[in-house]
């Protein structure tokens, strides 16, 4: 069952038993890092739960409606976007609307399924209102919360739900999926390692979702910088560098810095001859050659500089200022 979702066999077994249990919890929490397929499995589980035959094989009207997220017995609560396409936290109005819907009985099934995606991104007022719903759950409801972490979920909510933890899947499975997207073998292996077992992350990085280019374009920029150090004329270099251009987006800068951090880490692994720990396996020969130009102490300091830059960007320091400062600091470090 749910063979279209790779991995997570233990979680699937739990949900299969849930389908036929006489007594079952009314609320579940799917918890684990982003990109593991938690939302996809929640929807597949809801489809099976609402299906008359409990097969979810798309043969009935219920399955077809749910596949299009148009089922009268499915409530899907998700974060909304603001005018700048940034996701906002789940607000009190969304939870109040959910509470209003709890007054209505299921239409096509004996069950109504409510899925709250990014449940760890609720504002406090929304979380408190949702807690009241959990304390007196509507008859026939199955509530599924989806979260990357439990740290920001109220303890009083956690005490009333059953947690189902999701873990990163094997790199070989991630490789298998991204190859189907048309990625060549060596790059698929690199994507699997960089995404650390998160299929969603691997696919987004390959497609460049929300960015102007894909992962490998930004990695090439970061690698070219490391290959250019020491800079003969830093100011001239900066004037030509894409990441100090005024049109370079904040999210592009964040991705570039993260990739630069991985490259520096890989150079350090090469110095230590820990080749099985390398993320960017598709450019291993290049990394080996580049590592010969660096001292271990310098690589560790450079990693610190890049981490400082990432923190600055997360705290909304200007992209141009942050990237220029990082470039100059790493160049000076290499010249010491």
Question: Could you say what each language-model-derived stretch is?
Answer:
Residues 128-145:
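Conserved catalytic/switch belt of AAA+ P-loop NTPases
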Residues 117-118, 145-150:
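A short beta-strand-to-loop transition that corresponds to the Sensor-1 phosphate-sensing loop
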Residues 100, 132, 155, 159:
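Conserved adenine-binding aromatic site and its adjacent loop/helix in ATP-hydrolyzing domains
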Residues 1-125, 291:
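Clamp-loader machinery-focused feature within the broader ASCE/P-loop NTPase space
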Residues 123-132, 313-321:
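A short, hydrophobic/aromatic-rich structural module that often spans a beta strand
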Residues 1-48, 65, 139-141, 149-259, ...:
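Charged, glycine-rich active-site and insertion segments that engage polyanionic ligands
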């Amino acid at each position: 069952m749910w063979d279209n979702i790779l991995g997570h066999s233990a979680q699937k077994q739990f949900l299969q038993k849930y389908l036929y249990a006489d007594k079952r919890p009314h609320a579940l929490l799917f918890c684990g890092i982003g990109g593991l397929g938690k939302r996809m499995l929640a929807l597949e589980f809801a489809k099976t739960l609402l299906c008359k035959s409990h097969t979810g094989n798309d043969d009935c009207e219920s399955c077809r409606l749910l596949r299009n997220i148009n089922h009268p017995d499915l409530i899907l609560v998700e974060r909304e976007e603001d005018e700048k396409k940034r996701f906002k936290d789940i607000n009190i109005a969304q939870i109040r609307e959910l509470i209003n819907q709890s007054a209505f009985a299921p239409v096509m099934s004996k069950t109504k399924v409510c899925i709250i995606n990014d449940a760890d991104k609720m504002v406090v007022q929304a979380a408190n209102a949702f807690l009241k719903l959990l304390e007196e759950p509507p008859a026939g409801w199955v509530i599924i919360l989806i979260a990357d972490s439990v740290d920001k979920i109220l303890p009083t909510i956690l005490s009333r739900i059953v947690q189902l933890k999701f873990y990163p899947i094997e790199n070989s499975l991630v490789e298998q999926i991204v190859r189907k997207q048309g990625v060549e073998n060596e790059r698929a292996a690199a994507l699997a390692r960089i995404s650390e077992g998160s299929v969603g992350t691997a696919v987004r990085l390959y497609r460049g979702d929300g960015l102007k280019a894909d992962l490998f374009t930004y990695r090439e920029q970061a690698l070219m910088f490391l290959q250019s150090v020491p800079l003969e004329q830093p100011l001239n270099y900066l004037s030509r560098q894409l990441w100090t251009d005024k049109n370079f987006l904040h999210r592009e800068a964040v991705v570039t810095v993260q990739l630069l951090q991985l490259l520096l880490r890989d150079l350090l692994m090469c110095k230590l001859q820990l080749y099985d720990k390398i993320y960017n396996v598709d450019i291993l020969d290049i990394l080996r050659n580049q590592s010969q130009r660096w001292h271990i102490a310098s690589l560790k300091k450079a990693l610190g500089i890049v981490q400082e830059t990432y923190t600055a960007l997360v705290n909304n320091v200007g992209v141009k200022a942050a990237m220029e400062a990082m470039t100059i600091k790493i160049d000076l470090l290499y010249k010491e």
